[in-house]
């Protein structure tokens, strides 16, 4: 488990040396937000550039999030494109890029639309080479604002205070408190626990602005982390082993052992990188060792 904080312009003036001294290893920065007045006005966080440069100078891992108002696919795409062009481009991030889903004015009572918005955001940034994820509250977000079963492929950052998440059973990061304190800063802070070695996954997969050769000093991952180059999108495969029912999908949704399916997408850097399915669109997630190329 790795401890980190998430901050925005509300924490302007915080001395990041105090963050390092308190034992925190990463920061998730608010890159920007969509204004709730129109739901389509995009704004960079006033402290994003400052915090990014200060964090990198101190060796802190950095991720980012976008406060979303999107309630359909195209709005999700638009938010992602604006974030990329104005916040992400030319930088390197050691932690995922998240869509923050909590806006009550635009994202309440629209589960189907919000689900599509999340897909639009995540697919757009994945296609640009980013490791993406979803931030939301355990109940009021993941349960009430989206169809989580349609978003199995994406990493989850779950907010729940007082106890670990209960509705979301598979997640990479937990926001455990909004009242964290550190010496030298007179204010509350959001505290987080990461359960994956995101810097290693991201750097070795060449994502989030890092070179494809796995740039950085992080050791190479275990063989199961990096997808086999022998399998690619469009290949027909036979399922010869089980998929992953806890992190990225349920193998049973793609058919049993011995069934023939097609590789629909490859998620570099994931332990179960191959999404397979058939003409009905049902999918499951597998390692290369569980698939036989036909």
What annotation goes with each model-predicted range?
Residues 219-268:
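Beta-loop motif signature
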Residues 20-23, 57-58, 90-93, 127, ...:
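Extracellular/periplasmic catalytic domains that process cell-envelope and extracellular macromolecules
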Residues 1-122, 126-129:
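Substrate-binding cleft of extracellular glycoside hydrolase catalytic domains
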Residues 125-143:
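Aromatic-lined carbohydrate-recognition surfaces of secreted/lumenal glycan-active proteins
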Residues 278-294:
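Intrinsically disordered, low-complexity, charged/polar segments
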Residues 1-13, 17-18, 149-222:
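Functionally critical loop-and-helix segments that line ligand-binding/catalytic clefts
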Residues 269-276:
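Short aromatic-glycine-enriched beta-strand elements
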């Amino acid at each position: 488990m790795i401890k980190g904080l998430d901050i925005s312009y509300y924490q302007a003036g915080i001395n990041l040396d105090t963050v390092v001294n308190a034992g925190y290893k990463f920061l998730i920065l608010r890159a920007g937000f969509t204004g709730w007045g129109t739901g389509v006005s995009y704004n960079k966080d006033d402290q994003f550039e400052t915090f990014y440069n200060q964090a990198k100078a101190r060796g802190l891992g950095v991720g980012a999030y976008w406060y979303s108002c999107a309630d359909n696919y195209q709005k999700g795409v638009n938010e992602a494109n604006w974030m990329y062009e104005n916040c992400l481009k030319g930088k390197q991030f050691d932690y995922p890029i998240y869509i923050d889903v909590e806006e009550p004015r635009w994202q309440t009572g629209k589960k189907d639309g919000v689900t599509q918005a999340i897909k639009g955001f995540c697919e757009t940034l994945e296609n640009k080479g980013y490791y993406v994820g979803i931030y939301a509250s355990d109940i009021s977000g993941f349960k009430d604002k989206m169809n989580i079963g349609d978003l199995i492929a994406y990493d989850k950052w779950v907010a729940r205070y007082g106890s670990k998440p209960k509705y979301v059973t598979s997640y990479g990061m937990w926001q455990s408190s909004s009242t964290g304190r550190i010496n030298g800063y007179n204010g509350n802070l959001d505290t987080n626990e990461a359960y994956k070695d995101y810097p290693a996954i991201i750097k070795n997969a060449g994502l989030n602005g890092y070179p494809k050769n796995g740039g950085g000093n992080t050791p190479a991952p275990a063989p199961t982390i990096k997808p086999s180059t022998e399998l690619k999108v469009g290949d027909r495969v036979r399922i010869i082993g089980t998929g992953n029912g806890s992190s990225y999908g349920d193998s049973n949704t793609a058919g049993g052992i011995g069934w023939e399916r097609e590789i629909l997408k490859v998620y570099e850097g994931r332990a179960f990188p191959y999404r397979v399915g058939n003409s009905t669109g049902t999918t499951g997630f597998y390692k290369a060792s569980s698939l036989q190329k036909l």
